[in-house]
Amino acid sequence: MNEEKWDDAIAAYKKAIEIDPSFVQVIFNIGITLNSKAISLKDQLANKSTGRLSAADNQKVVDVLNESKGYLEKLKEMDPNQEKTNWAYPLYQIYYALGDEAKANEMQQLLKK
């Protein structure tokens, strides 16, 4: 999916939570879509021969991951027992990608339950 499609989906989800801010599935979808956008962006921006990102391109990916993290952390507060959504694994992926080992380990423990 190209960046424009990710952004269209995210905008639609954000409109939905303006109507119902407690709709956990939509909040989950925003977090997942942003996470997918970050992965796609990383693949798109990576140097084709080395697979590495420039500092500026890396920051673009980090910014999207941080936005995704915000939605998933909000969801963690709203649905702490993961009764409506399984937020632990995508949040683990984000913490891992951002290098937050302590929080990644915390999520990994939740995944073992």
Identify the residue ranges that each predicted region occupies.
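Short coil/linker segments at helix-helix boundaries
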Residues: 36-74
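Residue-level recognition of tetratricopeptide repeat
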Residues: 23, 82-84
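Structural marker of alpha-solenoid helical repeat scaffolds
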Residues: 19, 78-80, 113
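Short coil/turn linking the two alpha-helices of tandem helical-hairpin repeats
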Residues: 1-3, 31, 36-47, 97-100
